[in-house]
Structures are given as C-alpha cells and as structure tokens.
Amino acid sequence: MAGQGRGAARRAGVCSAVALLALAGCGAPPPDSASREIQSMLDRRARALLARDEAAYAVGLDTSLAPAALKEFDHLAEVPLGSWDYRVKDVDRTGRDRATVRAELGYRVSGYDSGPVTTERVLDLIERDGRWYVTADRPGADAAQQLWQQGDVEAVRGARSLVLGVGQPEERLRAIAAAADRAVPAVSAAWPSPWAGRVVVLVPASLDAMGGLLGAPGASYRGIAAVTTGEVRGGPDAPADRVIVNPEAYGVLGAFGQQIVLTHETTHVATRAATSPATPVWLSEGFADWAAYRGTGRTAAQAAPELRRAVRAGDLPAALPDDKAFAFGGDADALARAYEGAWLACELIAERWGEEKLTEFYRAVGAHPSREGAVEKALHEVLGTTPEDFTAAWRAHLGARLG
C-alpha cells in the first residue's frame, strides 16, 4: 500500500522576483545554501539517532519540540534500525528566520529490509545564530503515522520473525512471533519460489491506532484481523512488507484462526515480487487463503461458511469476484463470500492442474504488462483453458464442494 519515491534533494517551485527581493532585503541566505544547511542538520540528527546519542539528537531541536521529539527517540530504543536518513525535497522560506521543509525519511530494519521504507515528513524550522532548529515534525499530506509515534515500541524476535508492538503484553507479542515463525515454512512449502523467508509484524494498541498506521479511519478495518503493506512488484532492494495486526479482531480468534491469518498475510509477503497491477485481487487473496488452509484438513464447508449458505440457497455466483468485491467497510458477508470464492478458485487449480501449475499461473499473470488480457493469456498458456471454461469449472466446483 505504499508507494515510495526517491530523488536528489532539490528546491521545487519558482519564486517571484518580489519574493526574492523581499528575502534578500531581510538578509536571508540563498535558498540552496539554506537547503544544504538544513540537510546537514538532519544528517547529524539521523546519525545521533542511530548511535542512540540523545544529547546529540537534541542539539537540532527547538525547546518547544524537544520533549515530544525525545519521547519518540525513546520509543525507538528497541527497534533494530540498520539505517535512518532524511532527504530534503523542498524548502519553503516562510520568513527571515523560518522555513517549512518537505523531507523524505528512509529507514531500514536491520536483518529484514533490503531497502529503506520511505515516508514523507514536513518539518517547521527556525534559524538562530546561523543554525537551524526543528520546531515541528509531522507526516506529509499522504503519509501515515509510524508505529513509534504511538508509544514505546517493544520488539520480540522470533526465529523467522520480528514483532514490534505498542501497548501490548509481551506474552501476546511472543505468541504472535511464534505463529509468524510457523507461517514462514508453511508459506515456503506452498510458494517454492525464492523469497526473504522472514516477516515483520506490527501490533498497534488498538483499531484506531491500526488506522493511523494505514492512513485511514480505523473503522475501515473493523473485523479485519490483519493486513499487509508493501510495494507491488518490489525489486530486490524493496523493503520488507509489514504485516499489521488489528489487535481487536485478531484477539477474538482462536489459535487456529490466528494461524490462518498470519500464514495468509505472510503469503502476501512471499508473493509480492510476483504480484503486479496485472494481478486481480481474487488471485492474490485466493492464493493467500489457499496457502493458509493448505494441509490443515479443513473442509470447504468449514472454511467457506458464507458462500456455502449462498450456494445452498440457490445463489451460485455467476463470475469470479471482481476487485471491488474485496473492498473493506462494506457488507461483511459479501466480503467473506468474495474471499471464499477466490480461495476455491485457487483450490480448483491446485486440484485439477496441480500445485506447480497454480504457482506458475500466479507468476504468469503477474508478469503480464497490464491487467487487460493477463488472466486470459495465463489460462491459455499455463492451464490450457479459457475464461469461460474456467468459470464454468469453478461454478461446478463450488456446487460440488458446498452444495
């Protein structure tokens, strides 16, 4: 869900002659000079944070911001950061000694991220005696909160996982790490293609806090036990995805349900490099559910109760669910039927054509340059069938498994 951009630090925009004269008359330094000075200050701030040098970190803070900023510094103490840096993108001189800066913050969790996670920050600064100080630091217009801005982060390391939580008991974080550790080999068995083989899980304190991490109202995710964020079609330098747990919905599940959730989300992490805008949601979500239920012994009636009710009531779906059917915040029963139908489509492929063909089909769809024709081409080339015949086979499969 995240899209990142990288670029050299440059001042964007065009200033009018009047504005330039006004700044010059006030004795303001040239914009490029201010950008360099601000970048240097932020570089020092980043080095101090990585070194856990609180005194050096505080040097660039205005007294009005210092208490809040030093709290965030403390909140990050347990996070195993491998890198942390800022790139100044734009400096807006709002007065003789004032500036507002748009900067890209990039950070990497050591041992998990091959590339930095990036997010935009907006910083207000004041200049005193030739030095710049940060007076405010907030997310950019389209940026979400970061976990450490919500409280002290507790880190629990599993054998194949890192769980970062705020406001959660340690035993709960350890249980999530154990489930994530079990998920990784299960996913590797279902998805034999190379992937990182590890997962980062974020556990915020509440549903609303989860919404803050996703830049959306928490109510949008009510009833959703977890989601995964990351770059679609991330390259080898893309950061690891983040699995974000909804502590309320996840907490009401039993051990089996919790394991299914984490295996499902870990599957998204594993398949990310093969997932692209050409991949329909039914395939990405259906495959993740197929991988999660694989080998558990659960029947279709147990795993697809909403769709079973519909089929038994004579409401057999006419077509595979479209992307809109998977939108959060709508009819919960309809959403469940979409997931269940997608899972059974992938189960059909695995049973009729084989598991290797299912993963080959997934990769073939994701490799297509666009959504148009992606599924049709993969159905023909990998499975030797047509959309019409596959849909008919899927509907028959639903009737046989759920009727």
Roles of regions detected by a PLM:
Residues 157-280, 371-374:
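Juxtacatalytic substrate-recognition/specificity segment
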Residues 22-25:
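C-terminal motif of bacterial Sec signal peptides marking the signal peptidase cleavage site
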Residues 111-152:
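Short beta-strand edge/turn micro-motifs at domain boundaries
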